[in-house]
Curated annotation (Swiss-Prot):
This is Leucine--tRNA ligase. Belongs to the class-I aminoacyl-tRNA synthetase family. The keyword Mitochondrion does not apply. One of its GO terms (cellular component) is cytosol. It is found in: Cytoplasm. Its main location: cytoplasm. A motif ('KMSKS' region) lies at residues 719-723. Its EC number is 6.1.1.4. SUPFAM superfamilies: Anticodon-binding domain of a subclass of class I aminoacyl-tRNA synthetases, Nucleotidylyl transferase, ValRS/IleRS/LeuRS editing domain. It comes from the Bacteria. ATP binds at residue 722. The lineage of its organism: Bacteria, Bacillati, Actinomycetota, Actinomycetes, Mycobacteriales. It catalyses: tRNA(Leu) + L-leucine + ATP = L-leucyl-tRNA(Leu) + AMP + diphosphate.
Amino acid sequence: MTNPSDNTTHRYTPELAAQIESAWQQYWKDNGTFNAPNPVGPLAEEGKELPAEKMNIQDMFPYPSGAGLHVGHPLGYIATDTYARFNRMLGKNVLHTLGYDAFGLPAEQYAIQTGTHPRTTTEANINNMRRQLGMLGLGHDPRRSVASTDPEFYKWTQWIFLQIYNSWFDEEQQKARPISELIKELEVGKRTTKDGRYYADLTKEEQRQALDEFRLVYLSNSTVNWCPGLGTVLANEEVTAEGKSERGNFPVFRKNLRQWMMRITAYSDRLLDDLELLDWPEKVKSMQRNWIGRSRGAEVSFHAEGYNIDVFTTRPDTLFGAEYVVLAPEHELVDALLSPIPYEDDVDKRWTFGHDDPKEAVEAYRASIAAKSDLERQENKEKTGVFLGTYATNPVNGKQIPIFIADYVLTGYGTGAIMAVPAHDTRDYEFATVFGLPITEVVAGGDITKEAYTESGQAVNSANDSLDINGMSKDEAIATIIPWLEEQGVGREKIQYKLRDWLFARQRYWGEPFPIVYDEAGQAYPLPESMLPIELPEVEDYKPVSFDPDDADSSPQPPLAKAREWVEVELDLGLGDGPKTYYRDTNVMPQWAGSSWYQLRYIDPTNDEIFCDLENERYWTGPRTEEHGANDPGGVDLYVGGVEHAVLHLLYARFWHKVLFDLGYVSSKEPYRRLYNQGYIQAYAYTDSRGVYVPAAEVEEKDGKFYYNGEEVNQEYGKMGKSLKNSVAPDDICRDYGADTLRVYEMSMGPLDTSRPWATKDVVGAQRFLQRLWRLAIDENSGELSTTDAELSEDDLKHLNRTIAGVRDDYENLRLNTVVAKLIEYVNYLTKAYPKGAPRAAVEPLAQLVSPVAPHIAEELWKRFGHEGTITYEAFPEFDEKYLVDDEIEVPVQINGKVKARVMVPADADQATVVGIAKDDERIAELTAGKNVVKEIYVPGRMVNLVVK
């Protein structure tokens, strides 16, 4: 490789930095410097012994935005690259690459806005992102990079979907098993169907339906979040608390549709319990615990009109106080329980929503709440509802209690029905007060004439002929009433979860097609693996049919339905009936599909036989109990990304991975052993008097106020982005300062897990540090080495060894800001101590120490020191423990609490010795002459205080 600094100034300028960076990036590319070998398969290296120690480091799957990157985006990428480079220097085999999560709503919306096909815009965006990240010198293994939009990738997304589809969850074994094993058990009568029938007694069609009730993927007519403005349905997690779409902020309505669902609820306990095995931030664990929402209580049946209304309650001890039942307006029993006749004359008019007929009242009420979010429905101060005209029986006292629908009850939690105990629940109390319903005290301790009493207390008014819980505490009453409910056949103990099954379909174009076809009768059939991938057809009209955002009555019309030649196919599925006409599913998978398993494809990206060879997976993500303890779940060693993915991506990925583990395809129980949430780089933005954002770079500050074109503007602090006109491109910083400068600056800004403000004016500080580093090794006039062969002094050895020890510990613990601080401190020491040339033995290790965070300049210095090849795999410097302990320490000496001098004392000196040295100090002796020292205080290693009079 040619010397990048030939025929140019020898000062470390942005121009020289650019030459050095370009040359070394080309060297890394040409030599496959960051290629990590696998144990087996296409990426294995024959004749090479695989390092026993490995490190699998991963960034969260980025979406390739059309807007390109701003300087906030690379923060995590630089951090993981720094950590990866450090671990390579420890002799570990490091897997570090970056792919692109390119399917989904954002890419499609961008394509629609620009009028360009999403494949074209996506490929262009990926290329631009690769270009921008390439400037930073990130040490990725390019052979392992994938995009979720590559057919070679989504072939395996479809394959995994089929594995999940063809599986069921065995409650006894608490694991997924192939559906073929269930069929065998059903055929011999070892198991019955969900409703207790024998499989052999069923018709073929009934058998298919019975199996679908077990599958981990199933079609369901269920209430979904319909967003007319986007023309698609959304998962609960994609809807904001205000009832708007996360993408585009459009209104979202509740609607019954037939959709693919994934039975993630089967894994509720494992998803919850296995959080304890993970090295994750407690905040993220808490968010997942709350989302899964496990609670213990009882399921109780209220008989009504030939049906059982099942309700879940954590307080079955209050059953005697249940005065009415409330169903969610979308509950499946509402229409069946509606009275077919008009309301009786004596029905309270407050119960009828202004109508004489229950059916009309329910229809009007449903329409009135269609646009309300779940949060609005739960927090709504005004309690509303409709009486169905029918009654349910309270199972503990036989009382006939009215059945209502009300928006504060949701289908997404529990059974979608509640027993209302107004005396002891605030919302029930408010509802009962508004509607004039009875309020019966069953827990002593409060004044229910004023408000609901929601604390624990002794049971009162709670007895029948065979049950008496009066006088019992809450726990005792619950322990007594549940067995009674079970004996009577009207209830049972139950654990309930907030977690709902995962809505797994979108009415869009830009997503993975389902490997499913339907016959003329609408029956679904999985396609054989030999037909994968089912490629997304190229269509001219890829736009979804969107509607007026407020049109709640609209229905989805997927764009793929327009591709008739693709939809209608002649296939022989090997069912014994020969070729038939089938119809492809015109929905696509949600944008979370590819990111639910991509970490496994990074391991084996070119394998055509399987998504990831088990031996390769075991090496890179398998449990390592000797290193991480007996309960190590395995997984990626370090996963870095934002906390915003705590519930969505991370929960879905854990679910998919656990199914693959149960089926024997992976050895690790969890996808990610360690999670680290990086903070964000934020910036100031400015708005004029109209509230319009103005370019931040053109705003001037005068006397604490901010001006744009002479007009005063308002300053606000938060995100960085093009829409806020405060975006700074990494391209510009790399051009004006150099990539290493950008890397050092971003790592120095503060702890990695906290957010920090961007300030372009401060970047020069990182540049000056690298210039001082360069001058320690290179003569700026001649370009030759400026170091000497002098031996290191004791002081040099202390500074060097302490820097090595401190920097190593900081790298290991991702304290990258203090890494930079320690390196700056050491460079400053050498600069001051050796203005005319520092010893080579002091500077050469510095190139190794700085290499993870500023790799280009480190490579160049290493080469200038006469080394061949790359610094990447040079061993990280070792330190000598003896230089980490001081022989002497400096101790401040106070007189009456004020520091008057500082003295050097032996590090292990006792109080008498230290005080004696302090008193002998010339300055202290002068100040205490002729005075009485009445007290001597010594805080070991910290200070001496002499109290004198």
